[in-house]
Design a protein with these regions (language model features):
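Phosphate/pyrophosphate- and phosphate-bearing ligand-binding catalytic cores of soluble enzymes
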Residues: 16-17, 23-25, 68, 160-271
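Short beta-strand or tight-loop elements
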Residues: 123, 153, 172-174
Length: 271
């Protein structure tokens, strides 16, 4: 660990020791990380990952902390905050003969990407507004809601391979399916993503975003510590099973404590 700290200091990469992870996840629980590293840009992120590998230090890439449950014991190793990396990078728009594209860093909050698209009159990301987490996390699991998925608008992904190579891949090469991507089977570090969007009516885009956000407010405990939607939706069914269809109806109601009020019974896995 001392070797890693020395390398981080020499490279000017910020870190904290014994940082409570409860401050960095939406469940608001979790013990301390030995090191909590805050790279400011892609170069520092790549350096941090390489330093961890060289020192044989276990590491974990953390975005917005909205899809993780940390143990009370914390994390023995280095937690790398990729949301800090996004602060040193901006969103960009470019065009070619095939259409319009927005490039975003992995650590950017997904909601910020959606608002940026709205500001510039681009449609296609309305479904993602209100999904917690970062661009990188959403790409990693092919996040989706209300009939849309990341793969629907994703053009390409930049990532660091396990052996330290920087790779740009088209989305079609990354095995996207329902809540799955090739990144779940490899040790790659997502650096950024490019989205192919269409021009639309800003008023209609904003109205749809507000409509979906209101649905979230009505159905989900957004004001409580939560990991968001916990369960995958089975094909042709719902993740939430009404108590009267559950063989363990009594157990479900005991877990809830208040019949008819359990989020586990009302929506797609909010607990």
């Amino acid at each position: 660990m001392e070797q890693l700290k020395q390398q981080l200091q020499a490279a000017g990469i910020l870190y904290k020791e014994n940082e409570p992870l409860s401050a960095h996840c939406t469940f608001r629980i979790g013990g301390p990380a030995d090191l909590f590293v805050m790279p400011r840009d892609e170069d520092q992120l790549c350096q941090t990952v390489q330093f961890c590998k060289q020192a044989e230090i276990r590491y974990y890439l953390l975005g917005n902390g909205s899809n993780i449950l940390f143990a009370d014991e914390g994390f023995r190793g280095a937690v790398i905050d990729v949301s800090a990396e996004a602060a040193g990078m901006g969103l960009s728009i470019y065009q070619n003969a095939d259409g319009d594209y927005i490039s975003a860093p992995a650590g950017l909050k997904l909601s910020e990407l959606c608002k940026f698209a709205l500001q510039h009159g681009y449609t296609g990301l309305e479904f993602a507004y209100g999904i917690p987490g970062t661009v990188g996390g959403a790409v990693y699991m092919n996040a989706g809601a209300y009939g849309g998925e990341m793969k629907d608008v994703l053009e390409a992904v930049s990532y660091l391979t396990a052996d330290g190579r920087w790779v740009d891949s088209e989305a079609s090469e990354l095995d996207f399916s329902y809540r799955h991507s090739a990144f779940e089977e490899n040790d790659a570090c997502i650096l950024g993503a490019v989205f192919h969007l269409e021009k639309g009516d800003p008023d209609a885009i904003k109205a749809r975003m507000n409509e979906l956000m209101q649905k979230r407010i009505d159905k989900q405990p957004l004001d409580k510590p939560s990991a968001g939607s916990t369960f995958k939706r089975p094909a042709g069914a719902f993740a939430a099973v009404p108590p009267w269809r559950c063989r363990r109806k009594r157990q479900a109601l005991r877990f809830c404590g208040e019949p008819g009020r359990c989020h586990l019974c009302r929506c797609a896995g909010f607990v």
